[in-house]
């Protein structure tokens, strides 16, 4: 199982945005500089986040992005879904009768990996952007 840079960077950028969201809109350029993420890549990610109503853009000289909801209402699952990031620990499809080995039955460890995927998804369902901001603030003190 591997999260791609798209998913990891989306979360990093949104934690950065959430830290400054109460002050003014935050520019992608500022996030790019603080987090070391390519501006072009951030633009692609934020287009998806905007389309899925996680963020909204503010135009003008002091423009940038703001969260569309409170940070405590945005779960990691929402972010990953918005950028088309899927957590998948098994190769076979959930409803398929064929297993990940291409045979008619599931592999011997299928249930283990399926259970792990459920635990990971439950963790992401429970963890909010606010949790990550608080966690980051506590470690910096």
Give names to the regions the model predicted.
Residues 26-36:
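A short alpha-helical element within helix-turn-helix/winged-helix DNA-binding domains
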Residues 40:
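Key DNA-contact positions within bacterial/archaeal DNA-binding proteins
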Residues 45-50:
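Basic amphipathic alpha-helical segments that dock to polyanions
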Residues 76, 92-141:
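C-terminal regulatory/oligomerization modules of transcriptional regulators
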């Amino acid at each position: 199982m591997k999260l791609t840079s798209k998913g990891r960077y989306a979360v990093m950028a949104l934690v950065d945005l959430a830290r400054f969201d109460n002050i003014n809109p935050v520019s992608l350029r500022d996030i790019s500089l603080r987090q070391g993420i390519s501006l072009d890549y951030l633009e692609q990610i934020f287009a998806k986040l905007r389309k899925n109503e996680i963020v909204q853009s503010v135009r003008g000289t002091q423009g940038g992005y703001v969260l569309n909801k409170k940070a405590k209402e945005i779960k990691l699952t929402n972010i990953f879904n918005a950028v088309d990031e899927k957590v998948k620990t098994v190769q076979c499809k959930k409803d398929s009768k064929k297993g990940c080995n291409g045979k008619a039955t599931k592999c011997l460890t299928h249930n283990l990996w399926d259970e792990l995927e459920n635990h990971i998804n439950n963790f992401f369902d429970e963890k909010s952007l606010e949790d990550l901001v608080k966690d980051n603030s506590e470690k910096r003190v």
